[in-house]
Amino acid sequence: MDTEQAIEIQEKDPVSSPPAEIASSPERFINRELSWLHFNRRVLEESVNPRHPALERVRFLSISANNLDEFFMVRVAGIRAQVREGIAERSPDGLTPLEQLKVINESVSQLAIDQQAIWRDLRKFLAELGIVLVDGQDVTKSERAWIEDHFLASIFPLLTPLAIDPAHPFPFIPSLGFTVALQLMRTSDGRPMNALIRMPGKIDRFIRFPGSKDGVIRLITLEQATSLFIGRLFPGYTVKGQGAFRIIRDSEIEIEEEAEDLVRLFETALKRRRRGSVIRLEIEANMPEELRAFVQDALSTTDDEVFVVDGVLAMNELSQLTRVDRPDLEFAPYVPRHPERVRDHGGDIFAAIRQKDLIVHHPYESFDVVVQFLQQAARDPDVVAIKQTLYRTSNNSPIVRALAEAAEAGKSVTALVELKARFDEEANIRWARDLERAGVQVVYGFLQLKTHAKLSMVVRREGGGLTTYVHTGTGNYHPVTARIYTDLSYFTSDPVIGRDVTRVFNYITGYAEPIDIEKMAVSPLTLRKRMIEHIHGETSFARQGKPAVIWMKMNSLVDPDIIDALYEASQAGVSIDLIVRGICCLRPGLPGLSENIRVKSVIGRFLEHGRIYCFGMGQGLPSAKAAVYISSADMMPRNLDRRVEVLCPLQNPTVHQQVLEQIMVANLKDTEQSWQLLPDGSSTRMKAAKGEEPFNLHNYFMTNPSLSGRGKSLKESSPRRLTRRNERNPS
């Protein structure tokens, strides 16, 4: 192994077939859904990582729960729909939809049990640290008096007690809705009644008691506080039994082939989604059996859609606990750097780009430079046109404001707003209307393709002609997520890249297929072909006895054709290192198939989101002659075939070196936040080699300047050079 770390790998025999048979059988792939569940388990494992502060561990637990909710809303919902429709088509790994549901349920059941066990331990740990979550029966006399006043003033007006009988049918419960079910008895005549109390979704789940002794913070959940005062909601009734439940609904949106008004179509589809079928019903374990049957029957759920939870529901809301004022239990604040080269030019972003290409590495370097790029364009009298894609952005988005400002200043502004960005559809409809009111030409792209490419283009009058400035990146134009996602922003005034981006926009706005793209590759047209050609190229170098190396960094590796090409390359002797944060359907390390492929996943303080693809071109890696790309695309069929994505080459020597020799090497070198993927799809934590210090790539970039953004500061500070053990060209 030519990486700098020694890795302890558990010996496992994931498949019974010999390698020769695996190479042509479905067993060569790991199931996509199970691979995602393995990823979510890695996230969950960070909640027990002693290196993390306590509240950050709670945050990781919350993230794993939120991830699981979305998995059911989208992936499980889709598989259940296939089962309902009688579709028996097998996944690439050979499972029918029904078989996939079975293995998913088995894996999720254990994951949910582990989440609850971890929460019980974390709750005790927080109490030791002075953050106490109390149950209703444990409140003190003074706390009960305070919570009663608070309940009547701030909670009671928001609650609607719902009796269930022929005159009061079971109400609609929204997805992720948290509800308390009750068995009541009228005290006057003993008459039984079932009832519901829907917990309001717009207020905090955790209520903090005022005052404390010795700095101890005491909190109670909204549902526990409500349970103390059921009599206020149902006077004249006695509670005989109760329990909370929560549902998850199908969140897929079906789009009609023929649509005259795409915005109106999505508004209608969003209303339908709110009433999607229930695909998961979570019920507290202490709910009486009769009451549980009542809820299940009312929601028309089958037994395999019901999950009995021995613990807390809606664990995604545990993230609210991180709002308590205990900075000592969180990561130390980090303030992103501003690229020194932009400062050297007095804040003139266009002058900085004219000097040479620039890579901004988020979140270590501020996303403000991207906002500044558009704000300066909006206010610069020499700028005549701006074109922009928007997939996801933030509330009160400065990107949207800058585009509106530019249009109001009389510039030609075109914005592609992707309405099909899952769970951001409503926000994007709102942004589209705001932009149209400001005079922006808004388009929605293709009905059957999502535009996922991250592109911004500014055309400026310079020296009697026009210069095109381009920003393209791996992440969304979202200032909030840019503080916690690792992504790359690439700025260039390369006229060839400018022409390529112009053609991509023409493709999006006018369906003009960009047949003469010069440097970039675009899906669904040429990106897959470019990737396969590069993989085959390294395979050919290996067969000629030349150095042959591939490094890739992505979120997901699913596409069967890409995986098979990598298998072929491995069999030819190509050295392949893959950094895959999430889903990986490739089996690494199988003799005769993938023994030259190593796969790792980095899970840490920041969410790894950038996509980088590197090919040695017969020189090995790292090498100044390597082909290095950044992209918005993962290696999934949806990115390669059903989305508009771009693959952008990095050819400026400094930018090339920064991405290849600094960013990629740091990712490969990391041992403190990395997991080694095993042939069966599971993973094990990586460890530094004996006698060597653990390496944390996030800490490295928080304390070392980037190569392309240093400017004059190069004289005062250079990044610590990274090397990998046996840094040589493999032959």
Curated annotation (Swiss-Prot):
Q: Where does ATP bind?
A: N67, Y485, R581, H609
Q: Catalysed reaction per UniProt?
A: [phosphate](n) + ATP = [phosphate](n+1) + ADP
Q: Which domain of life is it from?
A: Bacteria
Which keywords belong to this entry? ATP-binding, Kinase, Magnesium, Metal-binding, Nucleotide-binding, Phosphoprotein, Transferase
For binding Mg(2+), which residues are annotated in this chain's numbering? R392, R422
EC class of the enzyme, as a word: transferase
In this chain, the stretch annotated as Disordered covers 1-22, 701-731
Cofactor(s) needed by this chain: Mg(2+)
Q: How is it modified after translation?
A: An intermediate of this reaction is the autophosphorylated ppk in which a phosphate is covalently linked to a histidine residue through a N-P bond.
Q: What is its EC number?
A: 2.7.4.1
- Pfam families of this UniProt entry? PP_kinase, PP_kinase_C, PP_kinase_C_1, PP_kinase_N
Q: Where is the active site?
A: H452
One GO BP annotation is: polyphosphate biosynthetic process
Instruction: Return the similarity comment.
Output: Belongs to the polyphosphate kinase 1 (PPK1) family.
| Annotated function | Catalyzes the reversible transfer of the terminal phosphate of ATP to form a long-chain polyphosphate (polyP).
Q: What is this protein called?
A: Polyphosphate kinase
What is the native source organism of this protein? Bradyrhizobium sp. (strain BTAi1 / ATCC BAA-1182)
